[in-house]
Design a protein with these regions (language model features):
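A domain-level signal for the structural core that forms small-molecule/cofactor-binding pockets
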Residues: 1-187
């Protein structure tokens, strides 16, 4: 996906423009380090939601039909408008279909992979729901609280703001007590 040589040259150009001493020792290897950083941060750009669903399809048939809530999944992403950092707290709820549950470690992995793209917070929730739907789930709720550097650290500079988005599928769209049970579980 990434043309490593082009990226290294681009990083050198940026450093030459923003630093008065771009040749100093501390910056000598910075373009290569930036390449590794970008490859890690944007790894999710290499995969479609179908790919992600296939990667993390580890389900167990246990006969459960009870609500499952996982709170506090911590991820980072970058907004597509400024490439600014977004720090996200993601909460997922679902009702198992046909008694199948997804391995718990797969939820953070899915969240992490869809976050490793240039994104907007709303789409991250939609992408997580889409991946879970591809795994056969119907009743899904994704609640994301995000701190956006494009608001917190630049421009309007409002460091205390947190943006909440909800993505609802299935019963969560119309079952208010069920939706409230999830919202009440989020601290």
């Amino acid at each position: 996906m990434f043309d490593e040589e082009k990226l290294i040259e681009a990083f050198k150009t940026i450093l030459n423009e923003i630093d008065p001493e771009p040749q100093r020792a501390g910056l000598k290897e910075t373009p290569k380090r930036m390449l590794g950083y970008f490859k890690e941060l944007f790894e999710g750009a290499n995969y479609s939601n179908d790919d992600i669903a296939e990667m993390f399809d580890k389900q167990f048939e246990i006969g459960s039909k009870d609500l499952v809530i996982m709170n506090g999944i911590h991820c980072f992403s970058h907004c597509e408008h400024h490439c600014a950092l977004m720090e996200l707290n993601i909460n997922i709820a679902y009702i198992p279909k046909d008694g199948k549950v997804l391995g718990l470690s797969k939820f953070p992995r899915i969240c992490d992979m869809v976050s490793k793209r240039l994104q907007v917070q709303e789409r991250i929730g939609m992408d997580i729901c889409e991946v879970l739907q591809k795994l056969g789930m119907e009743d899904i709720m994704v609640v994301i609280d995000g701190r956006h550097a494009c608001v917190n650290a630049r421009g309007i500079k409002q460091p205390q703001t947190v943006t909440r988005t909800n993505c609802l599928r299935g019963r969560f769209e119309y079952d208010l007590p069920l939706k409230n049970e999830v919202l009440n579980s989020i601290k």
